[in-house]
Amino acid sequence: MIVEERMKTYINSLDMGNTPFLQELEAQALANRVPIIRRDMQSFMRMLLAVKQPKRILEVGTAVGFSTLLMCEYGPDDLKITTIENYAKRIPVAKENFRRAGRE
């Protein structure tokens, strides 16, 4: 659909790239087949964070913590994120990634 393609083009034009830590985490997640948000949604999320300046976010599905750390990086300084994960094997991985990023 034309409108959908225009929207994707616009969202992709917003891509500023990520911090080196997020780039590394994204590469590890993809190599280990852990689902994380696609690049176009990363750009869209950064735009929403800039426009809305949320104070609180509830994230359902932490996985390795990539989206949480993306929101921490690009959200306002006083942003509080609560993230939940039901797959027990991923919880320690996410906690370690939060520690490594200095976002415990």
Feature-to-residue mapping (PLM):
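A short alpha-helical cap/connector motif
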Residues: 1-104
